[in-house]
A protein has these predicted regions:
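A short helix-loop-beta-strand connector motif used in the catalytic cores of GNAT acetyltransferases and
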Residues: 46-57, 75
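Conserved GNAT acetyl-CoA-binding A-motif
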Residues: 100-112
């Protein structure tokens, strides 16, 4: 990751860009979700979810948001990286910050997103439970994960 990438708290004026990153990331990694559901979720992200979490984002030297995480009550509720910046350590940096600075120890991941599951397993999380539906009651199973070890 470039040394010019910084972690910072996004402002309300960053919300439209956060939503763009969220949607691009979801479309790149959640191919099991129909378009109409992504559109519905996008509205929830903008109108409810961003305000319900403590946010941190990675910005580059041009102040573009490369990825972001949201934590509430010891849980990573959001971690999304723009597709063109995946594999560059952005998600790892955001997750490690969420764990070390925001006391995150739990998260849920879509069962149908094996790349995210592998990432969280690599970062020291383990699956401890499963639900048949997502947070809105739709048939997209979630795996419940908890931190069992920290990585360096």
């Amino acid at each position: 990751m470039s040394p010019t990438v910084t972690l910072q708290t996004p402002h309300l004026s960053d919300y439209p860009e956060l939503v763009r990153v969220w949607e691009a990331s979801v479309r790149a990694t959640h191919d099991f979700l129909p378009d109409g559901y992504i559109v519905l979720l996008r509205e929830h992200v903008l109108r409810k979810y961003l305000d319900a979490v403590m946010l941190v984002c990675c910005k580059d030297a041009r102040r573009r948001i490369l990825g972001f995480a949201g934590v509430a009550n010891g849980r990573v509720d959001m971690l999304f990286v723009a597709p063109q910046y995946r594999g560059q350590g952005i998600g790892q940096r955001l997750l490690r910050h969420a764990v070390s600075e925001l006391n995150a120890e739990r998260l849920d991941v879509n069962e149908q997103n094996p790349q995210a599951l592998g990432f969280y397993l690599h970062e020291g999380f383990e699956v401890y439970g499963r639900s048949e539906t997502d947070g809105l009651g739709q048939p997209y199973p979630l795996l419940h994960m908890r931190l069992v070890r920290t990585t360096s």
